[in-house]
Swiss-Prot record:
GO cellular-component term (any): ribosome
Key words, A-Z: Ribonucleoprotein, Ribosomal protein
Lineage: Bacteria, Pseudomonadati, Pseudomonadota, Alphaproteobacteria, Hyphomicrobiales
UniProt xrefs under PANTHER family: LARGE RIBOSOMAL SUBUNIT PROTEIN BL34M, MITOCHONDRIAL RIBOSOMAL PROTEIN 34 FAMILY MEMBER
GO biological process: translation
The keyword NAD appears for this protein: no
Gene: rpmH
One protein family per Pfam: Ribosomal_L34
Protein name as annotated: Large ribosomal subunit protein bL34
PROSITE patterns attached to this UniProt entry: RIBOSOMAL_L34
NCBIfam families named among the record's database cross-references: rpmH_bact
Single Gene Ontology MF annotation: structural constituent of ribosome
Length: 44
């Protein structure tokens, strides 16, 4: 059985990156919550 996590920088950016978050209302809420919490890194 292969491992479930097969790292890829491109897929990581496309699925969890800043622009992917900003593309949906829910994603924008995620960014807003992380900003409010004072996160150093907002997205992948």
């Amino acid at each position: 059985m292969k491992r479930t996590y097969q790292p890829s920088k491109l897929v990581r950016k496309r699925r969890h990156g800043f622009r992917a978050r900003m593309a949906t209302a829910g994603g924008r809420k995620v960014i807003a919550r992380r900003r409010a919490h004072g996160r150093k890194r907002l997205s992948a």
